């Protein structure tokens, strides 16, 4: 469950290392974001010569949460860290060209097939 002020890892090669959620998109007064939801983020820590820099405000999709996601068969997929993939504000396509770490199958149901195809492992 990601809410405002939550910090996440960037799971792509866009240049960001740590980001902070500043808004959960999708409805007025929506409090939490789960896997597959789009959030508004600001870059808190970035690497030199990356595509994004510290202070940039962008959209991102949540790909891993500590809370996890419950499957239809009753199993729960949880991760050690919260992570997101940075998106272009207008097209909502990934900024990076590589995805690090696993992503869940729930992203396949939404419009993020590009992220699923770039990911090294889909759980």
Curated annotation (Swiss-Prot):
Any coiled-coil regions, as ranges: none
Keyword rRNA-binding (UniProt): yes
UniProt keyword RNA-binding, yes or no: yes
A single cellular component GO annotation: cytosolic large ribosomal subunit
Alphabetized GO MF terms: large ribosomal subunit rRNA binding; structural constituent of ribosome
Pfam families recorded: Ribosomal_L14
InterPro entries: Ribosomal_uL14, Ribosomal_uL14_bac-type, Ribosomal_uL14_CS, Ribosomal_uL14_sf
Protein origin, superkingdom: Bacteria
Example GO biological process: translation
Disulfide bonds: none
Keyword annotations from UniProtKB, A to Z: Ribonucleoprotein, Ribosomal protein, RNA-binding, rRNA-binding
PANTHER family in the cross-refs: 50S/60S RIBOSOMAL PROTEIN L14/L23, LARGE RIBOSOMAL SUBUNIT PROTEIN UL14M
Biological role stated in the UniProt entry: Binds to 23S rRNA. Forms part of two intersubunit bridges in the 70S ribosome.
Assembly and binders: Part of the 50S ribosomal subunit. Forms a cluster with proteins L3 and L19. In the 70S ribosome, L14 and L19 interact and together make contacts with the 16S rRNA in bridges B5 and B8.
Family, similarity comment: Belongs to the universal ribosomal protein uL14 family.
Identification of the protein by name: Large ribosomal subunit protein uL14
Record organism: Photobacterium profundum (strain SS9)
């Amino acid at each position: 469950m990601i809410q405002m002020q939550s910090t996440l890892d960037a799971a792509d090669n866009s240049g960001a290392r740590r980001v902070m959620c500043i808004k959960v998109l999708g409805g007025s007064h929506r409090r939490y974001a789960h896997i597959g939801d789009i959030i508004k983020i600001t870059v808190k820590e970035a690497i030199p010569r990356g595509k994004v820099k510290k202070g940039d405000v962008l959209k991102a999709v949540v790909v891993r949460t500590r809370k996890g996601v419950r499957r239809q068969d009753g199993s729960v997929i949880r991760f050690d860290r919260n992570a997101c993939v940075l998106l272009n504000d207008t097209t909502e396509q990934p900024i990076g060209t590589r995805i690090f770490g696993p992503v869940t199958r729930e992203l396949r149901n939404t419009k993020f097939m590009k992220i699923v195809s770039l990911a090294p492992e889909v759980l």
